[in-house]
Structure formats: C-alpha cells, structure tokens
Amino acid sequence: APSLRLRF
C-alpha cells in the first residue's frame, strides 16, 4: 500500500 506521507 502506498504511503500517504508521499502526498501529504
């Protein structure tokens, strides 16, 4: 699963 930290 992609990390949300990459977007935020």
Swiss-Prot record:
GO process terms (BP): neuropeptide signaling pathway
Sites of Phenylalanine amide modification: F8
Entry's Gene Ontology cellular component terms: extracellular region
Cellular compartment(s): Secreted
Protein known as: Neuropeptide NPF-2
UniProt keyword terms in alphabetical order: Amidation, Hormone, Neuropeptide, Secreted
Family: Belongs to the NPY family.
GO molecular function: hormone activity
Function in brief: Neuropeptide. May be involved in the regulation of adult diapause.
